[in-house]
């Protein structure tokens, strides 16, 4: 009967008209015991990091050796284990191995919020531009692993501070914040452009925490005077496609009345991140990559930048679900009524039909 497909269609429509809800965090992996925490404002620690970017202050970027890469990979692996398994031994081992690279791993109890973090940063006696890496000490295993990155600090209009705000606001749902330690244009041949280097400590950290099913959000900024026709925010996955995280972020930004553009392979090509090294790695390993270019108009407008930061934070807290659609209660009621009518009619017809 032709009416049956119609009924099925109505049922399907009614199902998808329901609001989208996502399960709350059921279990929270607390930081391990046996760690000595330094209680101070995390922002104070981060300010030290921000004040040491090479390019902002005099200095020279130093190329790591193969041994440096191997040692850092060990450190990052131990941190990953320490957080995911709440294992104090791994954190203590990571701290010990980090000293071989003149890095320090600081367990910080943020006095402003009570949240706990591990901060991996170069000792103050050295400054090679290798970057700093912050990790939430408490991990929510029911959430999508999220990494926030700022590969172009200083140059990209305060991108490192924007990334930090999202990282801390979404605690503990963001696994890590990765921040380059050098201004992107310092090297004459692109040596310090971490978004386009296949070998760097920054890339090593990216690869250590980018896994199948994770989401990497990279924060960038562009000068509106150089791109006057672009919207306030341009999003891209790097190859002209769209992933769920990108769609969810775009939806939240639109709800905040921020104009957005999505690189589709053609439009917004200059801001599309086609050659972004971290994006290529993420896509190859089944992770979602979201490259976010923010107009300088937004960055220097307190209201707009707050809207941007809150939109991304909410996307993360919602596990990249779309904002709920308003339910139309009439649809499921009508569908149920039609189904009931034809069920009764069919039953009566079968009774009157001769055997």
Which stretches of residues belong to each language-model region?
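Hydrophobic secretory-pathway targeting helix
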Residues: 1-23
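Short, glycine/alanine-rich hydrophobic alpha-helices that insert into or span membranes
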Residues: 9, 336-339
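N-terminal catalytic or cofactor-binding beta/alpha core of small enzyme domains
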Residues: 17-290, 294-321
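Short, Lys/Arg-rich N-terminal segment immediately upstream of the first membrane anchor
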Residues: 1, 323-324, 354-355
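Juxtamembrane/start-of-transmembrane alpha-helix segments at the extracytoplasmic/lumenal side
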Residues: 321-335
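C-terminal membrane-anchoring or membrane-association module
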Residues: 340-355
């Amino acid at each position: 009967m032709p009416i049956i497909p119609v009924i099925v269609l109505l049922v399907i429509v009614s199902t998808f008209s329901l609001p989208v809800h996502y399960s709350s965090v059921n279990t929270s992996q607390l930081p391990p015991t046996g760690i000595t925490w330094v209680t101070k404002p995390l922002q104070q620690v981060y300010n030290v990091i921000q004040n040491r970017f090479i390019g902002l202050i005099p200095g020279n970027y130093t190329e790591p050796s193969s041994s440096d890469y191997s040692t850092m990979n060990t450190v990052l692996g131990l941190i990953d284990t320490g957080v995911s398994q709440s294992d104090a031994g791994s954190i203590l081992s990571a701290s010990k191995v980090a000293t071989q690279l003149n890095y320090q791993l600081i367990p910080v109890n943020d006095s402003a919020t009570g949240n706990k973090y591990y901060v991996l940063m170069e000792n103050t006696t050295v400054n090679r531009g290798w970057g700093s890496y912050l990790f939430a000490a408490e991990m929510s295993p029911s959430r999508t692993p999220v990494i926030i990155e700022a590969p172009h600090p200083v140059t990209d209009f305060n991108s490192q501070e924007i990334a930090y705000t999202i990282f801390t606001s979404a605690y503990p749902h963001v696994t890590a914040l990765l921040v380059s330690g050098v201004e992107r244009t310092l090297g004459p041949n692109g040596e310090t452009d971490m978004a386009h280097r296949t070998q760097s400590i920054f890339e090593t950290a990216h690869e250590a925490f980018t896994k199948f099913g994770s989401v990497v959000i990279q924060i960038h900024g562009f000068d509106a005077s150089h791109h006057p026709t672009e919207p306030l925010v341009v999003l891209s996955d790097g190859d002209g496609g769209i992933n769920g995280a990108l769609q969810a972020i775009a939806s939240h930004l639109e709800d905040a009345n921020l104009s957005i553009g999505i690189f589709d392979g053609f439009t917004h090509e200059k801001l599309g991140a086609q050659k972004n090294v971290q994006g290529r790695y993420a896509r190859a390993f089944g992770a979602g990559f979201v490259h976010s270019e923010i107009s300088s108009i937004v960055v220097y407008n307190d209201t707009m930048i707050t809207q941007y930061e809150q939109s991304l934070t909410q996307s993360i807290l919602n596990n990249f679900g779309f904002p709920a659609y308003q339910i139309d209660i009439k649809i499921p009621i009508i569908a149920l009524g039609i189904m009931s009518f034809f069920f009764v009619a069919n039953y009566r017809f079968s009774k009157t039909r001769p055997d």
